[in-house]
């Protein structure tokens, strides 16, 4: 027997078997220790108050006593300031727990901060959704979903013509064999939208100030109701209509215009109710806060420039409805446009101010439907000018001339 054959048959050398190593076993994942019943009960017992009151110096035992009364963080956020004060008084009377002065202010400050945080989260979420919608519309390569953005803008000067020209250019590039046309078009559209939104935010931050509420906006081109800084469709223009007449075609009548002022009054009442519930400052006139609330409620057709533009026309409608109706009928018969009718509404108001000692502000404040509106600057200037003219004319005559006599002379044709 060959010893070499026996050895080679018994011990076979396999290099691959030596190189392969057994895989190391994977250690089982470490299981987290389950929360003890005491820990879970601790978090449920406080109801989120520890995170709400933590940075405001409220003691732990105070938060525990509030939680024992059945209050949670969500409950406190939805309460008014008067209700918070009642809760703290109940805490002192029931548990005989002495609240520190800083704790009382800290509880109110924590609730206000939580309200602001929730409101900011809602605004960020809505802006994020709006940005996603605009981005999706820009990537699709079509401007059909962006009718509001492609409409003509009074401030930026944009119109549909550049958009159509861009679409034609992109189509020509794609038909010419360039596959980057859609991508370039989408990037260009997104950049334009971002620039437009940035400019609108800057403009709104400059003009959206409640301190300048008394200023008139006569110099703005808002006959069609196009507000600056708002993404809305251009509305139908107004035409002169008689009382009870419905405008035909894509037009709006004057009855609809006066109805918008009644809606603004309702929105003001809603804003006042919300402000009282929150313990905030309650507006007494139609301010930017009311217009923002109207837009948030879906009434995009109500905007500050348009309502300030025709407020003196609405004032004439409230103070002397017969004169307003007669003026509307006369301009309707003559076929005058709404701009001429708007200018003609100043003179009757100046005459009304003359009968009340030229105090047009007192005339507005005395009327329940006009007291919520600011007096237009132009109307106040006309009253001041007419008053100076009347005083100068009275100084030249012996004994002077009264306002009633001046109106009688105007009626007879002696101007």
Curated annotation (Swiss-Prot):
Acts in the floral primordia. GO terms for molecular function: DNA binding. Residues 174-183 have a biased composition (Gly residues). Residues 234-238, 303-310, 374-377 bind DNA. The keyword Transcription regulation applies. Residues 159-221 are annotated as: Disordered. GO terms for cellular component: nucleus. Residues 193-202 have a biased composition (Basic residues). One of its GO terms (biological process) is regulation of DNA-templated transcription. Residues 206-220 have a biased composition (Acidic residues). Its main location: nucleus. InterPro entries: FLO/LFY_C, FLO_LFY, Floricaula/leafy_C_sf, LFY_SAM. The keyword Transcription regulation applies. The record marks 281, 288, 292, 339 as: Interaction with DNA. Gene3D superfamilies: Protein LEAFY. It is found in: Nucleus. Keywords: Activator, Developmental protein, DNA-binding, Nucleus, Transcription, Transcription regulation. PANTHER family: PROTEIN LEAFY. Belongs to the FLO/LFY family. Controls floral meristem identity. Is required very early in flower development and may act here as a transcription factor. This is Putative transcription factor BOFH.
């Amino acid at each position: 027997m060959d010893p070499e054959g026996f050895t080679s048959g018994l011990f076979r050398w396999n290099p691959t078997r030596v190189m392969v190593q057994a895989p190391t076993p994977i250690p089982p994942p470490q299981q987290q220790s389950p929360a003890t019943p005491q820990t879970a009960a601790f978090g449920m017992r406080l109801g989120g108050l520890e995170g709400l009151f933590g940075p405001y110096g409220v003691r732990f035992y105070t938060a525990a006593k509030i939680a024992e009364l059945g209050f949670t963080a969500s409950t406190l956020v939805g309460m008014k300031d008067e209700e918070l004060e009642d809760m703290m008084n109940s805490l002192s009377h029931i548990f005989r727990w002495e609240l520190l002065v800083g704790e009382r202010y800290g509880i109110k400050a924590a609730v206000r901060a939580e309200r602001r945080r929730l409101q900011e989260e809602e605004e960020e979420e809505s802006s994020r959704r709006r940005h996603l919608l605009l981005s999706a519309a820009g990537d699709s390569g079509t401007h059909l979903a962006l009718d509001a953005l492609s409409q003509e803008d009074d401030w930026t000067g944009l119109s549909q013509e550049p958009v159509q020209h861009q679409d034609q250019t992109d189509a020509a590039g794609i038909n010419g064999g360039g596959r980057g046309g859609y991508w370039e078009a989408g990037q260009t559209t997104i950049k334009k939208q971002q620039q437009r939104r940035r400019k609108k935010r800057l403009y709104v931050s400059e003009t959206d100030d409640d301190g300048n509420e008394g200023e008139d906006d006569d110099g703005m081109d808002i006959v069609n109701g196009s507000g600056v800084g708002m993404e809305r469709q251009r509305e139908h223009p107004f035409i002169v209509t008689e009382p009870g007449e419905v405008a035909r075609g894509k037009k709006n009548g004057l009855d609809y215009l006066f109805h918008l002022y009644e809606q603004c009054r309702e929105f003001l009442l809603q804003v006042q109710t919300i402000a009282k519930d929150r313990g905030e400052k309650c507006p007494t006139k139609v301010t930017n806060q009311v217009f923002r609330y109207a837009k948030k409620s879906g009434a995009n057709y109500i905007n500050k420039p348009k309502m300030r533009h025709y407020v003196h026309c609405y004032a004439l409608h409230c103070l002397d409805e017969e004169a307003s109706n007669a003026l509307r009928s006369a301009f309707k018969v003559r076929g005058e446009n709404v701009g001429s009718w708007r200018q003609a509404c100043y003179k009757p108001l100046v005459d009304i101010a003359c009968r009340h000692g030229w105090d047009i502000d007192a005339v507005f404040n005395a009327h329940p439907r006009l007291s919520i509106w600011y007096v237009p600057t132009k109307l106040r200037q006309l009253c001041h000018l007419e008053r100076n003219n009347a005083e100068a004319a009275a100084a030249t005559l012996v004994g002077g001339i009264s306002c009633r006599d001046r109106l009688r002379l105007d009626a007879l044709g002696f101007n």
